[in-house]
Amino acid sequence: MAELRSNMITQGIDRAPHRSLLRAAGVKEEDFGKPFIAVCNSYIDIVPGHVHLQEFGKIVKEAIREAGGVPFEFNTIGVDDGIAMGHIGMRYSLPSREIIADSVETVVSAHWFDGMVCIPNCDKITPGMLMAAMRINIPTIFVSGGPMAAGRTSDGRKISLSSVFEGVGAYQAGKIGESDLQELEQFGCPTCGSCSGMFTANSMNCLSEALGLALPGNGTILATSPERREFVRKSAAQLMETIKKDIKPRDIVTEKAIDNAFALDMALGGSTNTVLHTLALANEAGVEYSLERINEVAERVPHLSKLAPASDVFIEDLHEAGGVSAALNELAKKEGALHLDALTVTGRTLGETIAGHEVKDYDVIHPLDNPFTEKGGLAVLFGNLAPDGAIIKTGGVQDGITRHEGPAVVFDSQDAALEGIINRKVKEGDVVIIRYEGPKGGPGMPEMLAPTSQIVGMGLGPKVALITDGRFSGASRGLSIGHVSPEAAEGGPLAFVENGDHVIVDIEKRILDVQVPEEEWEKRKAEWKGFEPKVKTGYLARYSKLVTSANTGGIMKI
């Protein structure tokens, strides 16, 4: 084991004041010289994915003490994307990732901890902590709060939060009654935990396993299961072994590990937000990773599992089918799909970790010889509308749809788009453009779950494409293309599209184009008056000045 970092605040005559303060915080004489462990929690009452994490913090601290460490718990902030959806609150969601990363870095660096247990769960909390772990680079393990169970309607049908969002659109279109919508609302979110489909939170918690920063089960063991509590205890104990081996996050998160994470993402059809967060993570880890490389992973990794919202199969079903380890083990049978020699938090390789984890239900995790598609469930599109790339969750697109072209219907905000969709300004065959909603323009790159849910609920899901420099909830599905870079607020091509322009989306060829004569296009660019920031005070004003487009991970640069 390397020399303890905490010696900086515990050893020597001149550290007597430091020890005095530590004694006041409950540290005993025999604790000096033991590893000091940061227990980075994210308990918060208003977020259902986090309401139970106070208990998990206690389990972690108990396990750390039993293993010979001294735990110190602190908390980060958290935003519930579902509650923040569809109003100004969503502007704070992605920016909260940076606050979380900065706050974790601040607490851990100021107090010279020797190791860290991160207890995240929901959308921006997991990536925020991952980014911080890369910056600090001390032995760290991730243990998420776990997913909630799927809801069930009175007729036994499984549902999730996305069912409720889409239910609003269905109700407004006259497809269901008020009592049907009330039932969806009542039963859509039945327990604590991260929402029950392959949405952003669960995608990132599953990817933490593939990255090697979490033990098997992190992404799929239900929040309410006794198995989850035992998993939390086991993970905390593992950290103490990781400290002895001096394995740090940057030893684990290499180019190979990021390939493995995206391979899992492709196999499970994860949220498009994983691209945004993993690119930000790579930046913090000092790993250069391009969008083109993501397409290369998609070319060699098949789509093996179609989970909610793209189907009625939920995270609990994935767990029963063998979980992430079984999915990875199935992928490992294809040469070149994974880097099996990648290091994990235990000191074992990924190959050693997943060995023996067989698929228990091939209806949930398809075999290699019968994938949903030969290419992975995410794709990066390029073209004159997205010179620096755009993202589509191909795993959420209806089977058989690989191309869409039609006239643009342009909106300068999500609110305007939602109003236009509700008022039937969007019809079959259209391409909805929602711009000035990127990291800088939003600001905060808000999610477009309300418009996509409205489109699906009205029965237009397979018949309308939606393109935006904003992003999508993991609960979104259909022809939803987001993360268009550069964004409109930076003078990206979306800023120059007009109603009626012919737009082409070709998933197979990875193309996103608009057909406008070059002379006309240059005229529009010359006439563009620039972007006036929507927020001029507070954190969002500072954020919008420093944030970059989605192709960089939406990171902040000075």
UniProtKB/Swiss-Prot annotation:
Enzyme class per UniProt: lyase
Query: Biological process GO annotation list?
Result: isoleucine biosynthetic process; L-valine biosynthetic process
Q: Give this protein's Gene Ontology molecular function annotations.
A: 2 iron, 2 sulfur cluster binding; dihydroxy-acid dehydratase activity; magnesium ion binding
* Annotated cofactor note: Binds 1 [2Fe-2S] cluster per subunit. This cluster acts as a Lewis acid cofactor.
N6-carboxylysine occurs at which residues?
Answer: 124
- Name the chemical reaction catalysed here: (2R)-2,3-dihydroxy-3-methylbutanoate = 3-methyl-2-oxobutanoate + H2O; (2R,3R)-2,3-dihydroxy-3-methylpentanoate = (S)-3-methyl-2-oxopentanoate + H2O
Pathway in which this enzyme or protein is active: Amino-acid biosynthesis; L-isoleucine biosynthesis; L-isoleucine from 2-oxobutanoate: step 3/4; Amino-acid biosynthesis; L-valine biosynthesis; L-valine from pyruvate: step 3/4
Keywords, sorted A to Z: 2Fe-2S, Amino-acid biosynthesis, Branched-chain amino acid biosynthesis, Iron, Iron-sulfur, Lyase, Magnesium, Metal-binding
What cofactor does this chain's UniProt record say it requires? [2Fe-2S] cluster; Mg(2+)
EC no.?
Answer: 4.2.1.9
Q: Give the multimer and partner information.
A: Homodimer.
Q: Give the protein family.
A: Belongs to the IlvD/Edd family.
Q: What is this protein called?
A: Dihydroxy-acid dehydratase
Origin organism of this chain? Bacillus velezensis (strain DSM 23117 / BGSC 10A6 / LMG 26770 / FZB42)
